[in-house]
């Protein structure tokens, strides 16, 4: 016998399937009829518009005064050099929002993306071509790299950087493609429930799972404006009292993460037992764990990234608060 519903059915399952390093399929279900597309469409928009990426915003080239100049011994005109630089995908190491990176190359040689890697930045597009110089050329330049969202034209950047820099159109978005499908599914003999299936592809600056988490976090943040009036902070996630799926993931024990003995022992000696404890820590706090070496830190950071919780990201406040309460209960 059917029952009268007082609230919409709440989805309970999330599945993540890695298709490649830069592509993933994320499914959530079951939604009541019409609810899947209601959430899927804005999430797609947010993924494409609000994911944080990194881009070169300006370059200063020794011997070049403007973008229409040319350099003796360099095959490319400065304009082509700037276009090539714009197409190289960088990652800033650490928490900095902006870095200025300096380079100097002697010819003859081809300069590619991989040649721009140093302690401050990594490069995703390692094979991307930047310039070809001959033996007469010493190419010296500095690049301003900035984290951001969306797009900023060079005209706006010109007012921000110094007059000796050539501004560059900044395409920050790390998400290359997002598509979603709404599939019908059967729940307790009712065929009118839905599954939202996303396919997310990034350029390698961030993982698809991280991009998806950021989009969900932005949606939470935008909706929080209503909390000023309606006090939604104590609204229950489900009438059954079940924990959110994300919270269940965050209370996985660290000894179930398949870390090396060295990394596990460092965390264990620090009293860390659950994944969520690491996720709540800042990058500096993780690095400062006693007896945690660089190799162990890199392993832990890679593990957190693969799980969709990179060390430089923060949880939505409602999830973080619920996680702290849960951890207190588990460690009591």
UniProtKB/Swiss-Prot annotation:
Region (Alpha N-terminal domain (alpha-NTD)), start-end ranges: 1-227
One GO MF term attached to the UniProt entry: DNA binding
Gene3D superfamilies found in the cross-reference section: 5' to 3' exonuclease, C-terminal subdomain, DNA-directed RNA polymerase, insert domain, RNA polymerase, RBP11-like subunit
Span list, region Alpha C-terminal domain (alpha-CTD): 248-332
EC number(s) reported in the record: 2.7.7.6
Annotated S-S bridges: none
Signal sequence extent: none
Any one of the GO CC terms: DNA-directed RNA polymerase complex
GO BP terms in the entry: DNA-templated transcription
Domain notes: The N-terminal domain is essential for RNAP assembly and basal transcription, whereas the C-terminal domain is involved in interaction with transcriptional regulators and with upstream promoter elements.
Record function comment: DNA-dependent RNA polymerase catalyzes the transcription of DNA into RNA using the four ribonucleoside triphosphates as substrates.
Family: Belongs to the RNA polymerase alpha chain family.
Protein name: DNA-directed RNA polymerase subunit alpha
Source organism of the structure: Aliarcobacter butzleri (strain RM4018) (Arcobacter butzleri)
Lineage summary: Bacteria, Pseudomonadati, Campylobacterota, Epsilonproteobacteria, Campylobacterales
């Amino acid at each position: 016998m059917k029952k009268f519903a007082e609230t919409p059915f709440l989805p309970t399952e999330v599945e993540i399937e890695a298709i490649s390093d830069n592509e993933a399929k994320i499914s959530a279900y079951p939604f009541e009829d019409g609810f899947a597309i209601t959430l899927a469409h804005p999430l797609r928009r947010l993924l494409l518009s609000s994911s944080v990426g990194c881009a070169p915003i300006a370059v200063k080239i020794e011997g070049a005064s403007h973008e229409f100049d040319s350099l003796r011994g360099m095959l490319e005109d400065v304009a082509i050099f700037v276009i090539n630089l714009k197409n190289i995908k960088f990652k800033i190491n650490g928490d900095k929002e902006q870095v200025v990176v300096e380079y100097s190359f002697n010819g003859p040689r081809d300069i590619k993306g991989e040649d721009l890697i140093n302690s401050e930045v990594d490069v995703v597009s390692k094979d991307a071509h930047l310039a070809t110089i001959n033996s007469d050329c010493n190419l010296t330049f500095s690049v301003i790299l900035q984290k951001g969202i969306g797009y900023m034209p060079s005209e706006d950047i010109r007012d921000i950087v110094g007059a000796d820099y050539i501004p560059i159109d900044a395409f920050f978005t790390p998400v290359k493609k997002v598509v979603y499908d709404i599939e019908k599914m059967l729940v307790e003999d009712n065929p009118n429930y839905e599954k939202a299936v996303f396919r997310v592809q990034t350029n390698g600056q961030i993982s698809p799972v991280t991009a998806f988490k950021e989009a969900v976090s932005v949606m939470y943040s935008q909706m929080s404006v209503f909390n000023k009036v309606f006090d939604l902070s104590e609204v229950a996630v489900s009438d059954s009292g079940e924990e959110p799926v994300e919270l269940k993931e965050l209370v996985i024990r660290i000894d179930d993460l398949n870390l090396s003995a060295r990394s596990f022992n460092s965390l264990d000696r620090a009293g860390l037992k659950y994944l969520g404890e690491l996720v709540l820590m800042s990058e500096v706090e993780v690095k400062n764990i006693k007896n945690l070496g660089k190799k162990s830190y890199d392993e832990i950071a890679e593990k957190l990234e693969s799980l969709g919780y990179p060390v430089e990201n923060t949880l939505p406040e409602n999830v973080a608060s619920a996680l702290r309460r849960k951890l207190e209960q588990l460690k009591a």
